Every structure is written in C-alpha cells, then in structure tokens.
C-alpha cells in the first residue's frame, strides 16, 4: 500500500466518504463535507498512524488531500 492509498484509507474511515471522492485536489471542508472537528480528528489520526507531530502552524495550511500527501512525503513518514 502506498502512502497515498493509506492516507485515503484513513480519510474514508474518518470522514465516511468514498475513495472515489478522495482526489488530491479535494478540499476537506468544501468537497468532503468535513467541519473543523472532523478535520482535527482526521489530523490526529494521521499523527498517530504516521508517528508525526503536525504543528499548529502547519495545521492551518492543510486544506486539501494533496496538502497532507505533500506534508507527509517531505517528512519521509512510514507506518506499520
């Protein structure tokens, strides 16, 4: 499973959307219907899964699926 596939799996589970809706340019709020609490829970799950801490400053910049992919790739994350 690639990093992108794992991210999409988490998004599908957390936001109860379909994998088809999870295109890189999809906005969590505008396209996937997430609210601020959903987004916070989603990013907490990402932190736990990928053993990375997302700073408050970085949280403000994550609005789309591609933002998460880019953020995690730069940090060379792995998961079990």
From Swiss-Prot:
Associated pathway: Lipid metabolism; fatty acid biosynthesis
Stretches assigned to the Carrier domain: 1-76
Compartments it resides in: Cytoplasm
GO cellular component: cytosol; membrane
Keyword line: Cytoplasm, Fatty acid biosynthesis, Fatty acid metabolism, Lipid biosynthesis, Lipid metabolism, Phosphopantetheine, Phosphoprotein
Protein name (database record): Acyl carrier protein
Taxonomic superkingdom: Bacteria
Lipid metabolism found in the keyword field: yes
Signal peptide: none
UniProt modification remark: 4'-phosphopantetheine is transferred from CoA to a specific serine of apo-ACP by AcpS. This modification is essential for activity because fatty acids are bound in thioester linkage to the sulfhydryl of the prosthetic group.
O-(pantetheine 4'-phosphoryl)serine: residues bearing it: 36
One example of a Gene Ontology biological process annotation: lipid A biosynthetic process
Family: Belongs to the acyl carrier protein (ACP) family.
NCBIfam families reported for this sequence: acyl_carrier, PRK00982.1-2, PRK00982.1-4
A molecular function GO annotation: acyl binding
Pfam families the record matches: PP-binding
Annotated source species: Syntrophus aciditrophicus (strain SB)
PANTHER family associated with the record: ACYL CARRIER PROTEIN (PTHR20863), CARRIER DOMAIN-CONTAINING PROTEIN (PTHR20863:SF76)
